[in-house]
Design a protein with these regions (language model features):
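P-loop NTP-binding core
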Residues: 1-255
């Protein structure tokens, strides 16, 4: 049975999409069958994997509102071992479309449960906000992976996210757990990065991955080329970091 991980942080600009793309690609590189679900209306995971968002006929939006079937949405083998449920700006209309729909929080779960046995990992890139898409993603997921940028307001975003996870656990998905925290955009030259890491460790009694994602020029360039970092520059510090994170995710004992 595939392990479903929602990559989430209600604070934008923390490396959420970067982590979704590159963790997924590195898992696929290691021979794992991966399905990536782009649940963010910005569609940056979709474009970061080399697809033109404007040309897509079927996306997560059409699936969520019942206009097409899951097999019509999944784009197989975007990379070796990696398939994609894409998104574009149309997904921003889902909130309004689903007003009054019964059990709308379970729409994604109902569909993904049909195919989870076909994959080792299903990675969901959540939007940076609390809305019906985030709730659907967390209701579907086994765990939540939390990227945290090493910056001054890191704890503020984290406290909001923990509150959301608790609400989902209480009302929709009691088995949801925190997969772990991964620090992103880390700059060892600054005292701030070091302080943020220590503050989060003090605040959160959860798994914190040993791998820390550094600030890296090649990592920042890769999305504009529609490539994950392990393909764009396989020897870069960013590629090495995400390969290490993939190893940790694979090794993490899961119940």
């Amino acid at each position: 049975m595939g392990r479903i991980i929602a990559v989430a942080n209600q604070k934008g600009g923390v490396g959420k999409t970067t982590t979704s793309i590159n963790l997924s690609s590195c898992l696929a590189e290691k021979g794992k069958k991966v399905l990536v679900i782009d649940a963010d209306p910005q569609g940056n995971t979709t474009s970061g994997l080399g697809l033109d968002k404007s040309t897509l006929k079927n996306t997560l939006y059409q699936l969520i509102i019942g206009q097409c079937k899951l097999e019509e949405v999944i784009i197989p083998n975007v990379l070796e071992n990696l398939s994609l449920v894409p998104a574009n700006i149309n997904l921003s209309g889902a909130e309004i479309e689903l007003i009054g729909i019964e059990k709308k929080e379970y729409l994604l779960k109902t569909e993904i449960d049909k195919v989870r046995d076909n994959y080792d990992f299903i990675i969901i890139d959540c939007p940076p906000s609390l809305n019906v898409l985030t709730i659907n993603s967390m209701t579907t997921a086994d765990t939540v992976l939390v990227p945290i940028q090493c910056e001054y307001y890191a704890l503020e975003g984290l406290s909001q996210l923990i509150h959301t996870i608790t609400l989902v656990q209480d009302r929709l998905n009691p088995n949801l757990e925190i997969e772990g925290v991964v620090f992103t955009m880390y700059d060892a030259r600054t005292n701030l990065s070091l302080q943020v890491v220590e503050n989060v460790k003090d605040y959160l009694n959860q798994t914190i991955y040993k791998t820390i994602i550094p600030r890296n020029v090649r990592l920042a360039e890769a999305p504009s080329h529609g490539l994950p970092i392990n393909i764009y520059d396989s020897r870069s510090a960013g590629a090495e970091a995400y390969r290490n994170l993939a190893d940790e995710v694979i090794e993490k004992e899961f119940y």
